Amino acid sequence: MLNDILTGYGIFILEILTILLLILAVVGLIISYRQHNKSKVGELEIKDLSEEFNEQVRLLRDFNLSEEEQKQRTKAEKKAEKQNAKKRKEKLKKGETLEDEKKACVYVLDFCGDISASETTALREEISAILNVAKSEDEVLLRLESPGGIVHNYGFAASQLSRLKQKGIKLTVAVDKVAASGGYMMACVADKIVSAPFAVIGSIGVVAQIPNVHRLLKKHDVDVDVMTAGEFKRTVTVLGENTEKGKQKFQQELEETHKLFKQFVSQNRPCLDIDKIATGEHWFGQQAIALQLVDEISTSDDLILEKMKEKQVLNVKYRLKKSLIKKFGRQAEESAINIIHRYSTKQSRDFMY
C-alpha cells in the first residue's frame, strides 16, 4: 500500500517537473527570439501585384470552362513554362545573361498621412531600399492620401520623394481621395500627378488656430506668468495675455511660411499660376486638371493595370515593429476617429450629395 502511494507520488512529481521544464523551454525560446529581433526596428515586405493579378485572371477565366478545357489550358501553360525554362538554361550554359528578359519594375508605395505625417518613417526606409536596386527604366508609383498637417513634417516627407527625382527615377503620384495642403506639397514633387475625379486637391495655404483662456483665468483670479528671453520667443500663448504686437508677429510668420510653400510648389510645377491657386482653396480632381494642379484623371487601380502590361509591379512596404500597448493604442485612436467622423457627418452635409 505504501509502495503504491510512493510510486503515485513520484509519478506526480515527475509530471510537474516535466510541465515546468516545458514552460521554461517556451519562455527561453520567446526571450531568445525577442533578443534576436530587438535590434530590428521593422522589416521590408514585398508583394508581387502582377502575380496576384494574373492569378485572379486565371481564376475568373477558368470559372466557365469545363474540367477538360481547364486541364488542356493548364497543360499548355506548363508546357510553355518548361520551354521557357529550357531556353533560359541554354542561355546560361552559353555564358549569356538573362538581363534582357527581365522586365522593368514599378515599385508601388502607400502613404496615408495623418497630421504628423508619421508614415514618413516607413517611407524613408522604402525609398532607401528602392534606390539601392532601381535602374533607370524602373519607376515609383505612390498612392497618396493626406489632408495635410504639420509644416516641417510634411516638408521632410516631400524631401524623401525628391530623393527619387535626384537619382533619375520617375515618380508618379496617384490621389484617389485627398492630397491637400501638406499632401499636395508631397504630390507636387512627382513627375506626374494622377487624380480621381472627385479627389480633393490643393489647399495651398497655412492655418493656425490657438484658443486663449486668459480672460477666463483672470475672471477667477488666476494669474499665469509667461517668462521669456527674446522679444518673440512666445508670440501667442494659450494661457497668457496675447498682445497686438505678438499677434502681428505670428501672422507675419504664417505669411512667410505660406511664401515658402508657394515657392516650393512653383519650383516643382512651374506650369502653375501660383497666385491663382495658392489661396488656400481646394478643388475636386476634374476641376484641378483645368488649373494644371494634376496631369490626368484616373484611379490608382487603372494606373496599376496599365503598368502591368509592360512592367513587373511590386508593392513595397516597410512595417515598423509595434509593442502590444502601441497596437491597442492605435486601434483605440482609429475607433475614436471613426466615431468623430460618423458624428460630424450627421451634423454637416459639406461635400456630400
From Swiss-Prot:
Principal cellular location given in the protein's record: membrane
Keywords linked to the UniProt accession: Cell membrane, Hydrolase, Membrane, Protease, Serine protease, Transmembrane, Transmembrane helix
GO biological process: proteolysis
Membrane topology label: Single-pass membrane protein
Protein origin, superkingdom: Bacteria
UniProt xrefs under Gene3D superfamilies: 2-enoyl-CoA Hydratase, Chain A, domain 1, 6.20.330.10
Cellular component GO terms held in the UniProt record: plasma membrane
EC number annotated for this UniProt entry: 3.4.21.-
Cross-referenced CDD domains: S49_Sppa_N_C (cd07023)
Stretches for region Disordered: 70-93
Subcellular location field: Cell membrane
Transmembrane segments: 11-31
GO MF, one annotated term: serine-type endopeptidase activity
Catalytic residues (positions): S181 (nucleophile), K233 (proton donor/acceptor)
Listed InterPro entries: ClpP/crotonase-like_dom_sf, Peptidase_S49, Peptidase_S49_N_proteobac, S49_SppA_C
Biased composition (Basic and acidic residues): 70-84
Family of this protein: Belongs to the peptidase S49 family.
NCBIfam families attached to this UniProt entry: PRK11778.1 (NF008745)
Function: Possible protease.
Name of the protein: Probable protease SohB
The organism of origin for this protein: Haemophilus influenzae (strain ATCC 51907 / DSM 11121 / KW20 / Rd)
Lineage: Bacteria, Pseudomonadati, Pseudomonadota, Gammaproteobacteria, Pasteurellales
